[in-house]
């Protein structure tokens, strides 16, 4: 019985992630999430009292996945700082690519509902700040900001590039991944001169 309950709860989380990624907090409806998950609306609200509570769980999961993908890649990479940053930039890009709705979701929620991400932001900011302060590179916070903006913007622009017929989204993203790594490494090299 416990495993069945756990799998149903996980189905709710999967459905909620899909709906929140497409519609954001304000546009999402718990009735739709319950239907997608194959549970009653009452069961959904038994597990998660409010839509905001469910949203926070999804947001925390996505941020933890993000954290794991980037910080673990950075920590596990061996060698000089350039090699470690190259791995972290690539891991961040790959993480976003495997979660295609995430860039738009992040931009919409950060701009439209900044209060909803505040608790998660504070927890991650302190860990990232600790990681940055341990790096022996000038302007580490700026470089981190550049990594985030370059990688996120690539996924926001990719559909436009494909629609205009310049190349497919996949071709564009394959090229941008390496260009973003090269750009960050060049900036790192120039900041250490």
Which residues does each predicted region cover?
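N-terminal intrinsically disordered/low-complexity leader segments
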Residues: 1-7, 193
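Short, basic, alpha-helical segments at the C-terminal edge of helix-turn-helix-like DNA-binding modules
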Residues: 30, 60-66
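Hydrophobic alpha-helical connector segments
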Residues: 57, 72-98, 137-147
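C-terminal peripheral helix-coil segments that are non-catalytic and often amphipathic
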Residues: 94, 126-137, 150-193
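Short alpha-helical scaffolding segments that buttress acidic/His motifs in well-ordered protein cores
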Residues: 89-92, 106-109, 147, 151, ...
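Amphipathic alpha-helical packing segments from all-alpha helical-bundle domains
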Residues: 64-71, 111-142, 174-178, 182
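Helix-turn-helix
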Residues: 11, 15, 19-53, 57
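Short secondary-structure transition hinges
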Residues: 53, 94-130, 166-171
């Amino acid at each position: 019985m416990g495993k069945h309950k756990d799998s149903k709860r996980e189905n709710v989380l999967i459905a909620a992630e899909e709906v929140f990624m497409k519609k954001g907090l304000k546009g999402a409806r718990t009735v739709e999430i319950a239907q997608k998950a194959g549970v009653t609306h009452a069961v959904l609200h038994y597990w998660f009292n409010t839509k905001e509570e469910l949203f926070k769980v999804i947001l925390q999961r996505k941020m933890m996945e993000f954290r794991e993908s980037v910080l673990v890649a950075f920590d596990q990479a061996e060698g000089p700082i350039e090699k470690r940053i190259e791995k972290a930039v690539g891991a961040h890009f790959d993480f976003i690519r495997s979660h295609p709705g995430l860039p738009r979701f992040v931009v919409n929620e950060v701009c439209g509902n900044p209060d909803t991400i505040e608790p998660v932001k504070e927890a991650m900011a302190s860990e990232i700040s600790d990681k940055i302060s341990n790096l022996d590179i000038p302007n580490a916070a700026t470089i981190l900001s550049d990594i985030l903006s370059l990688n996120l913007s690539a996924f926001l622009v990719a559909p436009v590039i494909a629609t205009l017929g310049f190349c497919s989204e996949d071709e564009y993203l394959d090229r941008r991944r390496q260009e973003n790594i090269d750009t960050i490494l060049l900036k790192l090299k120039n900041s250490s001169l």
